[in-house]
Amino acid sequence: MRFCLFSFALIILNCMDYSQCQGNRWRRNKRASYVSNPICKGCLSCSKDNGCSRCQQKLFFFLRREGMRQYGECLHSCPSGYYGHRAPDMNRCARCRIENCDSCFSKDFCTKCKVGFYLHRGRCFDECPDGFAPLDETMECVEGCEVGHWSEWGTCSRNNRTCGFKWGLETRTRQIVKKPAKDTIPCPTIAESRRCKMAMRHCPGGKRTPKAKEKRNKKKRRKLIERAQEQHSVFLATDRVNQ
């Protein structure tokens, strides 16, 4: 009787060991299949056709699409155009919803724009907004040089004189209100000049120089000659009519 009980106990123990061995063997085979399949790397649950369906705790689940096929992956960081969204059940890669964004911190805050676009306060622009200047080294919009309003046009002058010439220059200016964030960013023009007609061509009480007198006399002689030629032409025309 004792021998029968002892034999039965051995059979039960062997069955338990066998079941445990079979379970361990199944788990080892499952882990081995994960390792042998590249898309199952980092997965807690994976299939050959659909890839990962659950990821390890610190990894992000990403649903990759290739043509008509899609499969899950577990990644340490999300690819371009996606950001990592952590959640209690499983971390996921979510798509950036910002136009022309290459990498983002969240769905509405970009950290890097696509080529040809400038980053400004979490958005991407092809041209920086007013008051900001493009910094090509980092493709960001930084605070530019801010200037005030133009002053009124100054007095028309030439050689620091306001008389004695027919034409002169008048100038207006504006002040730099805020310096740019980078010294390499230029400021707009803060002074500009234009041609103007002087109010007084001859200075009061001034004496004309010999050169000015000669020029004036030449002009008078030229006008007298032109007038005489006109009168002579009229005389010839009248004479022909009378003949």
From Swiss-Prot:
Disulfide bonding pattern of the chain: 40-46, 43-52, 55-74, 78-93, 96-104, 101-110, 113-124, 128-141, 145-187, 156-163, 196-203
Transmembrane found in the keyword field: no
GO BP annotation list: bone mineralization; canonical Wnt signaling pathway; dopaminergic neuron differentiation; embryonic forelimb morphogenesis; embryonic hindlimb morphogenesis; epithelial tube branching involved in lung morphogenesis; lung growth; negative regulation of odontogenesis of dentin-containing tooth
Biased composition annotated in UniProt, kind: Basic residues: 204-224
Chain residue ranges for the region called Disordered: 204-243
GO molecular function, one term: signaling receptor binding
Keywords: Developmental protein, Disulfide bond, Glycoprotein, Heparin-binding, Secreted, Sensory transduction, Signal, Wnt signaling pathway
Chain positions of FU repeats: 90-134
UniProt remark on domains: The FU repeat is required for activation and stabilization of beta-catenin.
Family: Belongs to the R-spondin family.
The name this protein goes by in its record: R-spondin-2
Gene name per UniProt: Rspo2
